[in-house]
Structures are given as C-alpha cells and as structure tokens.
Amino acid sequence: MNFELTKEQQMVREMVKDFAKKEIAPHAEHVDQTGEFPMQTFKKMGELGLMGIPFPEEYGGSGGDTISYALAVEEVGKACGSTGLSYAAAVSLGASPLYYFGTEEQKQTHLTPLASGTALGSFGLTEPNAGSDAGGTQTKAISNGDEYVINGEKCWITNASYARTVIVTAVTGKNKDGKNIISALIVPTDTPGLTITSPYDKMGVRGSNTAEILLEDVRVPAANLLGDPTKGFKQFLYTLDGGRISIAALAVGIAQAALDASLAYAKERKQFGQPISSFQAIQFKLADMAMEIDLARQMVLKAAWLKDHNRPFTKEAAYAKLFASEMATRACNQAIQIHGGSGYMKEYGVERMLRDAKLMEIGEGTSEIQRLVIARQLLK
C-alpha cells in the first residue's frame, strides 16, 4: 500500500494550485455576486491542458489519470466553487461519456475539442419529472430513417448555455418486458429546434451556468447515437459514478478553503486579550474540520484509484460523494461560527462557501440516493 502521489500527480496538483491561486481565486467573489460564467478562465484552463487531464493525448487530452483529475478539481474548487462545479461537469459529464462509449469518429469529432479545451460539453439527464428517478425520463427520440427526432425538456443542466455539444438521454423504444429503453445522443447546441435558456436564480455556485433545454423536433444523425442504444441507462450510471468522484473532490476543495480561512482568522482575531485560536472551543472545531477533510480526501483518492485500475468503484464513489458533501456543509457552517458575526458577511467569503457546498449534497445524486446506492451494493 502506497499513500504517496506520483511525481506526475504532484506536478499536476502544484500546477493547478498555482494557477487557481492567481487566475481563479481573485475572481471568485465577482463570479458569485454577478452570476457571470467565467469563460475567460476556462479558455486559460484549456490552454493549460486542464480540460483534458484524464483523456489520452490522441484526443487532445493530457494523458493523466483520475487521481490527477480529482486533485485538479479539488484545487479549482478551493479557489472558487462555481468554477469548480463547471470544470467537474465539463470533464466528467460533458466529455467522459464520449471517451468511454463513443466511436472513433465520435471521439475525433466531438471529444477532441472538449479535451483540448477549445469547447465545453454538457450532459442533459435531469428533467422536470425525472430527478432522482432518472429512469423516469420522458424525453423521446424517434428513429426516422438515418436520423433521430428528439422531443422533450431538460432542466438544471450545467454548462449548457456555453456548450458546443449536449449529450441527451432519451427514450428510444421499449424492451421485451415493456420497459423504456433509454439511449444517449450527441446533440450539437446549434441544432435547429434546440432552445437553451438560463432562468434560474441559485442559492450558490452562482457563476456556474445552469440551464433549461427545450427540444422540439430536434433532428440528429443516427450516427450521433452514443454507445449501445440498449444500454444508455447503464452508461449514464457509469458516467454518474465517475462524476461523483469529481463532486466529492470539489466538496473537499470547498471545505479546505473554509478551513484555511478559519485557521487564518482564528490566529488573527483576538478576544479576552488573546487569539481565539488559543481557546479549546475553537481548537476542537478546527481539529474536527481538518480530520473530516483528510478522511474525505482519502475516500476520493481511493475511488479514483479503483477507477484508474478498472476495478468496480460504484460503492466507493458513493461513499466519497456522500461523506465529502455532507462534511463540506458541516465544515463551512463551522467556519462561519468560528468567524462569528464576520462570517455572516459576504466580504469574508465563508458564507459563499456554505452556499456553494450545499449543492454537493444534491447534484449528481442526493445524499439519500447515495445511501441507496451503497445499501444496494452491500446487499447484492
């Protein structure tokens, strides 16, 4: 058993840490207050190779592994939760399905721009009546000769307003048991009949684009069908498993930022003639935060390691996502408490971290769904 990162993984972490400190963190407050999507930041991230860390160089990627990618997500998330969420979604949801399930032509055409950072991708799964019940998808794709005609609605889709392509899940038929067959299709965002709006006013991660997608007689070539048409449900479950690793890493990053801010404040703030860091009540909070953050980080790294070694990782990804997300909310809440009245003020940033962290318990599978996933893995 080896707990040391490789030299390559350490280099990635240090590179992203330096970039995030200089290029992302200074804009975090502005991004949150205005809700502006940090497009220029993503262009720089693309130039640096961050958008393609876990993909082979032949598709425009950096040839890294899942661990390196998780470390990168943590560092970006530590600097800005909004940017971290859009980064995680672009890679894990927008690009990864193309790599794992796409044909060679689909990879060259659609994955390469995403992995090289010249475009963003998105993943359209959630619907108004299909949230946790993802199998309840109502969007339909009807085969019509050499194309599919798609009709339906998607909601709460990350990055869609700025994406070049959206991978859309849709019902394409029924199996012999009468159950819906859910498939995935690659839909360029400039396709006629596709309307993308962003009507949401969110509590947190406000600079991460969240969109609604309306599909009205959207026609795409049959060649845009992604993977096995009868296994679309399993494909997006695998996609979500990978995405949960990145959300867990993002939660760790946000929590680490809250701890860093709390340590600095506790050393500086004086009450009763001494720094509040000298009081046991504050020390216990800091100790609990640090312990839980490190535990969550190890969970993330283990799940990523399993994925890199082609071993089952569904349960471990759910472990990491569940614990890290709930931990981040606790850590950020404690950070506000340590800051006292100042923590309730926007200028200190920790209240933003709490608002950002809360989404980690909801997006890409709620805490309740994670517990179901874990229980089913234990009982099967």
From Swiss-Prot:
CDD domains: SCAD_SBCAD. Coiled coil: none annotated. It comes from the Bacteria. It catalyses: a 2,3-saturated acyl-CoA + A = a 2,3-dehydroacyl-CoA + AH2. FAD binds at residues 123-132, 156-158, 269, 337-341, 366-368. The active site is at 364 (proton acceptor). PANTHER family: ACYL-COA DEHYDROGENASE, ISOVALERYL-COA DEHYDROGENASE, MITOCHONDRIAL-RELATED. This is Probable acyl-CoA dehydrogenase YngJ. It comes from Bacillus subtilis (strain 168). The gene is yngJ.
